[in-house]
């Protein structure tokens, strides 16, 4: 599997691999990651995890610091890249 360099590149990862890797993260972290992502990546996350109520979770979280979003993005990239090493 080709390594990804940033969170936006998750859209290029095989869906089965991506879903397995992302399943390790709590819903709140997936929603926070989506807060700093493109509309395309947000659609991908919502499609992969239809059981997450993104709107309700966003209201519950309210505001999040960009540093936290960046930390979650980096952790997701690391997890995806290490998934099949």
Which role fits each region the language model picked out?
Residues 1-85:
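General marker for long, soluble alpha-helical cores
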